[in-house]
Amino acid sequence: MSVTVPNDDWTLSSLSETFDDGTQTLQGELTLALDKLAKNPSNPQLLAEYQSKLSEYTLYRNAQSNTVKVIKDVDAAIIQNFR
């Protein structure tokens, strides 16, 4: 996996923010699935759709968290090597 650095002034926060558009889309889909499920909680298809959307959202957030953590760890290792 490679990460393309957009410019010299990027930060971990800006890297994390690149995930925000996808997160907003997934959050909207998750909310819609939950609203449908709340109207008919005994429908197994709606439950499966909600669980699927929740899983997608969780995986996306984990990818965001892991990406930022990996970059942070690499940066920390570089700093440690300069000491």
Curated annotation (Swiss-Prot):
Changing L34A: Has a minor effect on IpaD/SctA binding to the needle and partially reduces invasion and hemolysis. Pfam families: T3SS_needle_F (PF09392). Changing Y50 to F/L: Can form needles. Results in a 50 to 80% reduction in IpaD/SctA surface presentation, which negatively affects invasion, hemolysis or secretion control. Its main location: secreted. Keywords: Plasmid, Protein transport, Secreted, Transport, Virulence. GO terms for molecular function: identical protein binding. One of its GO terms (biological process) is protein secretion by the type III secretion system. The keyword Secreted applies. It comes from the Bacteria. It is found in: Secreted; Cell surface. The helical filament defines an inner channel with about 20 Angstroms diameter and has an outer diameter of approximately 70 Angstroms. Deletion of the last five residues prevents self-association and yields monomeric proteins that allow biophysical studies. Belongs to the SctF family. Component of the type III secretion system (T3SS), also called injectisome, which is used to inject bacterial effector proteins into eukaryotic host cells. MxiH/SctF forms the external needle filament that protrudes from the bacterial surface. NCBIfam families: III_needle, PRK15326.1. The core secretion machinery of the T3SS is composed of approximately 20 different proteins, including cytoplasmic components, a base, an export apparatus and a needle. This subunit polymerizes and forms the helical needle filament. Interacts with the needle tip protein IpaD/SctA. Interacts with the export apparatus components SpaP/SctR, SpaQ/SctS and SpaR/SctT. This is Type 3 secretion system needle filament protein. It comes from Shigella flexneri. The lineage of its organism: Bacteria, Pseudomonadati, Pseudomonadota, Gammaproteobacteria, Enterobacterales.
